[in-house]
Amino acid sequence: MTDLTNQKDAALAAIAAATSLDALEEQRVAALGKKGWVSLALKTLGGMDPEERQKAAPAIQAVRAEVADAIAARKDALEREALEAQLATETLDLTLPAPQQRFGSVHPVSQVMDELAEIFADLGFAVATGPEIEDDWHNFTALNMAETHPARAMHDTFYFPDVDSEGRRMLLRTHTSPVQIRAMKAQGAPIRIIAPGRVYRSDSDATHTPMFHQVEGLVIDRDIHLGHLKWTLETFLKAFFEREDIVLRLRPSYFPFTEPSVEVDVGYSREGGRRVVGGDGNAEGHDWMELLGSGMVNRRVIEMAGLDPDEWQGFAWGLGVDRLAMLKYGMDDLRAFFDGDQRWLDHYGFSPFDQPTLSAGVGARS
């Protein structure tokens, strides 16, 4: 055992003197490797008688543990010293300019959505949302659209083969009007909301896509009349297009969910081959352009939402967000909105730092 003690003392001294991980590894192999002196000492236990083995085994195991602990402690110290040396050489110069990164851009639809929300928030409207997969009761029946209404046809609406727990057919919503029904049933009256979002119809050409964006507005209160509707739309369009010469023309129309119903035209002129909203459509060089549909909410729709139409009245309107973006920012093909062409996005996208505010003007700055 005297030889084992001497070997241990020599090994501990060599371990403490190791100045690198490689040198430390050599000491580990010399002591604890398959042919190391500790391993060889352990192998001698097999040739000892039981009494001798009972005394020698704990002593050898104690030496083995002491050497292993010394190696582990020295390894931690060497790794810590190496890390400190590395950190001392790797300094960060905070005066250096940051590397230039390419910023993404805000899609025109997202930009216009933000502009709409900013304007209507100033008018006291809240933003309401709802599911894009709807049942036919919320999408059609509750909006006074009969079973025979053309909009329910398969060639206009994307239906799912499934039905809900009440047997209602499921579909991709064709407008955001179901949000109005859900909001009235959940919140009651009075209510003042806009409902922006994606809608789906089976149509595709330069001005129509199977999926597009729509915003609808709803006001339910006492003593509401058509004059309130016209003022709201005029105020909104003046703020959105940032022009005071917005002139509207209301034409009688028909929508099953409003009565009376009106189509809203806006005066415009052509400048550089594009339509520019503003001015009287009857003036020289101007014309009228249909912009949106609106009207006073039908009594049956108010009843469907669980409200008393003798106490509560209201108006609603709906228009395409994509079309608004095209008119304001000069795009000419709706399909390009969804192509994902990076060149188009680079040209028409907006800075993420350009947040629309009424104080600075909601339009994106070039």
Swiss-Prot record:
Binding site for Mg(2+): 259
Keywords (A to Z) from UniProt: Aminoacyl-tRNA synthetase, ATP-binding, Cytoplasm, Ligase, Magnesium, Metal-binding, Nucleotide-binding, Protein biosynthesis
EC code(s) of this entry: 6.1.1.20
GO CC terms, sorted: cytoplasm
Matches recorded under SUPFAM superfamilies: Class II aaRS and biotin synthetases, tRNA-binding arm
Coiled coil: none
Domain of life, source organism: Bacteria
Cofactor(s) the protein requires to work: Mg(2+)
MF (Gene Ontology): ATP binding; magnesium ion binding; phenylalanine-tRNA ligase activity; tRNA binding
Enzyme class: ligase
Annotated cofactor note: Binds 2 magnesium ions per tetramer.
Locations listed in the record: Cytoplasm
InterPro entries: aa-tRNA-synth_II, aa-tRNA-synth_II/BPL/LPL, Phe-tRNA-synth_IIc_asu, Phe-tRNA_ligase_II_N, Phe_tRNA_ligase_alpha1_bac, Phenylalanyl-tRNA_Synthase, tRNA-bd_arm
Gene3D superfamilies linked to this entry: Bira Bifunctional Protein, Domain 2
Stored Pfam families: Phe_tRNA-synt_N (PF02912), tRNA-synt_2d (PF01409)
Catalytic reaction list: tRNA(Phe) + L-phenylalanine + ATP = L-phenylalanyl-tRNA(Phe) + AMP + diphosphate + H(+)
GO biological process: phenylalanyl-tRNA aminoacylation
Chief site of localization: cytoplasm
HAMAP family: Phe_tRNA_synth_alpha1
Family per record: Belongs to the class-II aminoacyl-tRNA synthetase family. Phe-tRNA synthetase alpha subunit type 1 subfamily.
Subunit-structure text: Tetramer of two alpha and two beta subunits.
NCBIfam families in the record: pheS
Name of the featured protein: Phenylalanine--tRNA ligase alpha subunit
Organism: Erythrobacter litoralis (strain HTCC2594)
Gene: pheS
